[in-house]
């Protein structure tokens, strides 16, 4: 895992606003958390724990790595991966807006 992703995970766990390079974590007044990559909203974590993910149309290794670091922060054993140029999450085909209800 990249250093920036470890720092991002710490910000998410500690519920603090943080920014470094192309990645930003911010929180709203209702306890929701948001992660952006290059200004694109790639993850929303609700105050109830639901996780909504998006590549924002950028299915790159960096986007996938950030999404997996976010998933690793809150869940065990689930990840975004690529097979034959198609992204998957668990057994499902990944799509922008994919939501994990917890």
Regions found by a protein language model. Give the residues of each.
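Terminal leader/tail segments of proteins
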Residues: 1-102
């Amino acid at each position: 895992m990249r250093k920036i992703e470890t720092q991002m995970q710490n910000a998410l766990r500690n519920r603090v606003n943080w920014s470094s390079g192309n990645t930003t974590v911010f929180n709203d007044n209702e306890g929701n958390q948001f992660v952006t990559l290059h200004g694109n909203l790639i993850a929303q974590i609700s105050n109830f724990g639901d996780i909504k993910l998006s590549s924002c149309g950028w299915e790159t290794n960096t986007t996938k790595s950030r999404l997996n670091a976010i998933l690793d922060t809150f869940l065990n054993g689930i990840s975004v991966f690529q097979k034959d140029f198609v992204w998957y999450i668990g057994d499902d085909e990944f799509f922008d807006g994919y939501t994990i209800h917890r």
